[in-house]
């Protein structure tokens, strides 16, 4: 892992989803790159921990904690995290309202054209662009950072020597960093992956504050 992506060019993505695959025992990131291609990226538990460590290490600098007395750090982080998640909830509601309005404008069921049936199981179809993430590169700005991933093409890399390729880069503002931390923790809980993290400023996604505690350790 290095701090700058150097001369390698990475396709940018600003839209992605994430789910846990019990079959792969990995998180699968499905991203739409700005060049129009869709890519699937496999994240191992080790790689997820690396991403989380980098996000948490950069967060104090991104949020200006260095200018804040250490005694107030947890409170500032908690307020920033709650604000970021509230913004996401508002954006999600707006998207849901737009989708509901679009569905309301569709023709009645009797007039609708028959659509092609979707695959019953998404794992039955191997994505055209599938990579195993093996390297994370981080570039930090004043109030933003970019995560860039390299990896091996799958399943080709399992049967023959393959070159490491740039998968995509994700530009993140401060709110996005908080939202990604929450998303990764949520998916790791679903995967039942133990996270050696303590983050008292973040509410566990399942609301189970009694059994799961996350607090940030400063070194």
Model-based region annotation:
Residues 2-65:
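The feature marks the first
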Residues 2-29, 83-161, 215-216:
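Intrinsic, low-complexity N-terminal interaction/targeting segments
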Residues 33, 37, 41, 65, ...:
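Alpha-helical rod/repeat scaffolding segments in eukaryotic adaptors/tethers
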Residues 38-99:
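Acidic (E/D-rich), amphipathic helical modules within compact regulatory domains
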Residues 64-75, 97, 104-114, 190-202:
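Short glycine-rich, low-complexity/disordered patches
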Residues 70-81, 128-140, 196-208:
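DNA polymerase processivity clamps
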Residues 149, 154-209, 218:
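Mixed-charge, glycine-accented linear interaction segment located at domain edges/termini
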């Amino acid at each position: 892992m290095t701090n700058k992506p150097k001369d390698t060019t990475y396709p940018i993505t600003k839209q992605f989803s994430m789910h846990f695959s019990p079959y792969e025992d990995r998180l699968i990131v499905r991203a739409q790159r700005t060049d129009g291609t869709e890519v699937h990226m496999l994240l191992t538990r080790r790689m997820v921990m690396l991403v989380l460590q980098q996000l948490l290490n950069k967060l104090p600098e991104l949020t200006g904690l260095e200018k804040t007395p250490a005694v107030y750090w947890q409170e500032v982080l908690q307020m920033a995290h709650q604000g970021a998640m509230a913004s996401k909830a508002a954006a999600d509601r707006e998207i849901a309202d737009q989708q509901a309005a679009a569905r309301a404008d569709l023709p009645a069921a009797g007039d609708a054209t028959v659509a092609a049936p979707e695959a019953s199981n998404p794992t039955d179809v191997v994505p055209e662009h599938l990579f195993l993430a093996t390297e994370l590169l981080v570039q930090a700005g004043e109030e933003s950072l970019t995560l860039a991933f390299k990896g091996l093409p799958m399943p080709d890399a399992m049967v023959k020597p393959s070159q490491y390729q740039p998968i995509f880069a994700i530009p993140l503002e401060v709110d996005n960093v908080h939202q990604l931390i929450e998303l990764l923790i949520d998916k790791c809980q679903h995967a039942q992956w133990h996270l050696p993290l303590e983050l008292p400023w973040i509410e566990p996604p399942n609301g189970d504050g009694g059994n799961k505690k996350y607090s940030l350790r400063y070194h």
